[in-house]
């Protein structure tokens, strides 16, 4: 007793200290994040998320613990207290269990508890450490009542030995120290459940704030909002309540089985009447949850991947849903029956259990189990028989209504129903006069691709080791073609397709000898400048032509060098410091007594002090201590370089920045930089990130190879590269999901009309969304059920040679005039070929300019016309003797020829094919444009420039 008392006296202070440590750390997290969200102007957004997370986490934890420990307390009260059967105060009401049976049952229950604990722990971990590269979807929450859950657990154990060892340890602990281990597991299990519930705060908010779609599903007639906003919450509640219910039942059973020294005596006397009534009550509750499970499963048939189409097919509608109903009824009746026995159960006669046929005692309890299994197995057999005898012989007739549903739903969910389909009949009418009429299209033909341009930038424009170009992006700018006599006069300008690349600071490239705390957090704080290249121009030596490049000019050492005065007027540059970007992964403090490296100049450096709006004051007082704790950076406390104005700039990675503010949105993988004047003299550079609302809950919508079956580009996010401010602009006000989030966070979103005009002119149709739609359109352009069923008109994404390897054609941006338009637009285009063939069948275009933004156009070629596809043109190019001879000569001459993207360019009612050839010398990796190949109909030419190639192609001189 003294030893136990000493242990208790030691444990209490330790637990108290650990508790204070955890609470203190949580307090630091909350206060630090509150200050950051205040700086961003989104404190209300953070507080709403936090309050729901805390409320749901604590609420579910308290309810779960209350239920579990109340039942364990009842079990302690009702368990056998004495070891001798003749002295039991209550007669057993069930047969006794020998030692072998006791060990088998206890081991099985312990293994199940251990498996549940591991499963719920992994689920909680996945919710609180999300992979933002994956779609942000309603989690696949498999209930322990599902066979798929058992299969998943067994798979995990077989592939991870340590999980099996943990389960074995828990089983052993439950056999030896039952009460102690049950209490520990109860607490851990409850904590995991509370993390899961808190991590699903978004589902709760969507449930209460959900905006109806005003579209009903074709099977049950529910508004689609029920499936997207409400059904995920019911699945979550099932997961929570089922987990608590099963664990509590098993914990109570173990408590009863190991009472009365049953392991020592080698036998369990049987369950008493109070024990049985307790177990009946728990079983009754689980049967009630099984009813909920079958109700949910009936709705989940609308996402069935089996059958001819995605969603509920003939068998699901005529058999599957009724099997779920019958199984639910059986579970409901069983729940009522067990509930009645728990409330009004009468004492059975003891002599019944001394009968030699005592196994018959279990018969009434096995009836619902057998009935349940019979219905389930019969349903599987009947479904298979009907599939073979009724459906397969007349599959199109039987499945036609469900094919129509899938086509209609998939097209609506991916916005394919908004596509304006037209016929494009190519004519042999392309000549010099037509080219002149479409000179803006010709002047914007993309010879430079982002990949070779980045390679060139890294060789010629990085300037210092610590600078890096992480990415390059296609955009368009209005470039002036003449200078006005007076500034206030209207400027004459043309659209110019360009490639822009940010020169960011890559601290990982700083030499090890210079890798100090001061350099990392006080000196190397930002990148500087960008390059801007027209896609169609080539400088001397085949290098890119730059509108904007370098750092420093004769007039101003901090300015970027521009190609002409016209570019000075066209492109706002200012002091292009990049404090927030794609590589800014570390936090910095500024201003301090240490000057920041601004940019290199000659053999030295120019220094600067940040004067932007970003950052949290940490120069003095408690905030310095707070963020030293939050960042675990004790150097902050001892640094003598801070001033009262010193600010902390953290979460400077733009993806992490926007995900922290709005984690419920999905973000495009490719943010792009924009140089635009929004009225701030110190900030001209901005990042635009496309954000999506997605779901995997749209009934009958086929996700294909994706994990989601509904998507909208609902939000455009703008991040200031200097100040770090973030603005969310709603781009699709008709999307019910973004309408729901706007109701939840009314101060988070702005109308797209509020975006500055200079930025709005740079929004573009996102490639990620377009690629998804283009992939879905391969099959779902077929709207006739019979054509769809037979796959008579299946399309494919064509192949091209890029570099030296074949690859699928990616979408590409063009400035071109659509067939029915009178002016050039910024277009995203994707070609198609028929299945197993190489000729073109169609091309899809997405518009990006002004009021036309977001409109999709599909131009289909007449099926009787043969139009060359990319692979066929590539073959013609490689078969041309002059071209192949020249390429072979280069490849033998210490260089390597890389083929660029083959662009198919619609010009009025004709198609022009253009492919640049890059030359890379063996001694360096700088790609240069060596030749441009142009094809029209059966004619192919290769010349040093695009202009020469076009002149030769349309002059009739191809000798």
From Swiss-Prot:
Q: How does it sit in the membrane?
A: Multi-pass membrane protein
Q: Which InterPro entries match?
A: UPF0182 (IPR005372)
From which domain of life does this come?
Bacteria
Q: Which GO terms describe its cellular component?
A: extracellular region; plasma membrane
| Family membership noted in the UniProt record | Belongs to the UPF0182 family.
Keyword tags: Cell membrane, Membrane, Transmembrane, Transmembrane helix
> Where in or outside the cell?
Cell membrane
- Its main subcellular localisation, reduced to a broad class, is membrane
**Protein's recorded name:** UPF0182 protein MAE_41360
The species is Microcystis aeruginosa (strain NIES-843 / IAM M-2473)
Q: Could you list the residue ranges that cross the membrane?
A: 13-33, 50-70, 99-119, 156-176, 184-204, 239-259, 276-296, 319-339, 362-382
